[in-house]
Amino acid sequence: MSSNFDKFQKRRLISSYFSVVLSVFLVLFLLGVLGLFIINSKKLADDFKEKIAMTVFFKNEANDSIIKAFNSELKRAPFALSYVYVTKEKAAKEHTDIIGEDFLTFLGENPLLNSYDIHLKADYVERDSILKIESALRKNTMIEDIVYDKQLVNLVNDNIKKVSMWILIISGFLTVIAVLLINSSLRLSIHSNRFIIKTMQMVGATKSFIRKPFVMRSVKLGMLGALLAIIALIGLLFYVETNFPGLGILEDKALIGLVLLAVFGLGVLITWVSTHFATQRFLNLRTDDLY
């Protein structure tokens, strides 16, 4: 009879441990996926921003020395990611290729201007930053005009802000759910040991002494769940990289490592905090309340 009871207790204990590891694994895996999505969504947003070009047109009076001086200025400019000089002849050829007709034959002259196509760094593709850059460039009296898609810049930045806000809301919601799920699993695990906790307290053991083995065990289970989540996340990363190489999901290894480290840290932190408060709850209960 005693043997059967011991087997039952052992099975219940294993089941309790398994539920803790599983809940930690699932929750941290979801949070890890969200973290990886956040760092890659910023990368995708930056890539899109850096594709928006600003075109600087020069007056016909601008000679080669002025063009070269402007080129040197761009080399030193902190906002310039890349730039290409487009001569009026090259621009005319491109227009001819697009419309399929040589417009120079009936115009008699080339009305186009020499220009620079400038791609800005993502941090500078903001409404205020671009206006400052435009204002600074217009001080050059040889510049005829500066053209870029203002509506697209505003639209991109507004949408990025909206997406970022929703990501933060979802992250906060998932974090709360994570803590509640893991906390619930740990409380159920400790609940089965409530009489042991109270017995140890009655024979004079200090609260910290009673808490220690439960906290250590839960932290180990949290570490196991976190490691399983990290393995699953690494597998997911390689799967995405293999099937969608164009995304370049493995390029920023430092940030990926930071996300994986955060997943492991959360596994330890959440289980430690949850177990601490769960054991404290049973330590504060009266003996009659244990039943």
From Swiss-Prot:
Pfam family, one: FtsX_ECD
UniProt-listed Gene3D superfamilies: 3.30.70.3040
Cell compartment(s), UniProt: Cell inner membrane
InterPro entries for this protein: ABC3_permease_C, FtsX, FtsX_ECD
Mutant lacking the gene: phenotype: Filamentous cell morphology and multiple septa. Filaments cross walls but cells fail to separate. Gliding motility defects. Resistant to infection by a number of F.johnsoniae bacteriophages.
Alphabetically ordered keywords of this record: Cell cycle, Cell division, Cell inner membrane, Cell membrane, Membrane, Transmembrane, Transmembrane helix
Stretches assigned to the Periplasmic side: 40-162, 242-253
GO cellular component annotations of the record: Gram-negative-bacterium-type cell wall; plasma membrane
Signal peptide: none
GO biological process: cell division; cell gliding; response to virus
Residue intervals passing through the bilayer: 19-39, 163-183, 221-241, 254-274
Regions of this protein lying in the Cytoplasmic compartment: 1-18, 184-220, 275-291
Membrane topology: Multi-pass membrane protein
Function: Required for cell division and gliding motility.
Family membership noted in the UniProt record: Belongs to the ABC-4 integral membrane protein family. FtsX subfamily.
Name used for this protein in its record: Cell division protein FtsX
